[in-house]
Amino acid sequence: MALFVFIGHDGPEGTARREQYRAAHVAALDKLDADGRIAFAGPIRDDANAASTGAVIVFDADSLDAAKKLMAHDPYVVGGVFANYSI
């Protein structure tokens, strides 16, 4: 396994969609964390007290292809929270 970094930047409807998909997103991350695959996960903010404008997730996967497939199923990705993301 190797570590990969996911960086997602919210789209114009990110805040509303984030609220809609938050519980499912957290549940998905909790499962990965329970499996020992999350090294770090947290929001991107413009300043300490601002609303989240994106996310960073550092996680373990077998390959870049596996990492892309895993993140493609994240509820925030599926729900359109992010305007763009990279791994």
Predicted regions and their residues:
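Conserved, structured core segments of small domains
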Residues: 1-87
